[in-house]
């Protein structure tokens, strides 16, 4: 069963996440740094020791859920117990990575998570993206992997992620979601 109606269920290996309860209060954006199919395969490999709740394909916005929202995916180190992780197809350093199909699907998903899990979408980051680690306040509840303490070696989803547009999409400011 999926937690978001548009998603396809394709479970991660049970070795790659925790069944401990997820006390969701934030949503974290990632880039796969590879392909959609390759990331699904990797999360199903028992030796990977990594997962995310959702993966989104760039070409058409297809959403795959791999970990139930009430479980802890392993995507953000010591922040896993309270976050939902969304992986986006492609690479953070690719200026052309953010297709409308993928961004709109991600925004619909995030808006749904916020509504169902009590996360305030208005607390999303709406500033610039970064090509280095950039810590933002804990009060920002929808943000990038490279904006979380303990993840200083990360910068995804990168400087090209359309944060201002995304903020508008998840807060009712036009677009498809």
UniProtKB/Swiss-Prot annotation:
Species for this entry: Achromobacter lyticus
Identification of the protein by name: N-acetylmuramoyl-L-alanine amidase A
Keywords: Antibiotic, Antimicrobial, Cell wall biogenesis/degradation, Disulfide bond, Hydrolase, Secreted
SMART domains: Ami_2
Domain of life: Bacteria
GO biological process: cell wall organization; defense response to bacterium; peptidoglycan catabolic process; peptidoglycan turnover
Catalytic activity, reaction form: Hydrolyzes the link between N-acetylmuramoyl residues and L-amino acid residues in certain cell-wall glycopeptides
Record-annotated disulphide pairs: 114-121
């Amino acid at each position: 069963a999926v937690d978001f109606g548009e998603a396809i269920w394709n479970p991660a290996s049970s070795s790659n996440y925790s069944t401990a309860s997820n006390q969701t209060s934030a949503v974290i954006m990632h880039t796969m740094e590879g392909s959609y199919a390759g990331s699904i395969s990797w999360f199903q490999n028992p030796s990977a020791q990594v997962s995310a709740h959702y993966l989104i394909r760039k070409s058409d916005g297809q959403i795959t859920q791999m970990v139930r929202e009430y479980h802890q995916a392993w995507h953000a180190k010591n922040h896993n117990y309270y976050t939902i992780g969304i992986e986006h197809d492609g690479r953070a350093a690719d200026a052309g990575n953010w297709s409308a199909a993928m961004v709109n699907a991600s925004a619909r998903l995030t808006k749904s998570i916020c509504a169902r899990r009590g996360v305030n979408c208005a607390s999303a980051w709406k500033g610039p993206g970064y090509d280095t680690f950039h810590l933002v306040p804990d009060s920002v509840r929808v943000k990038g992997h490279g904006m979380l303490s303990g993840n200083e070696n990360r910068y995804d989803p990168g400087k090209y992620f359309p944060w201002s547009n995304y903020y508008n999409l998840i807060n009712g400011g036009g677009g498809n979601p």
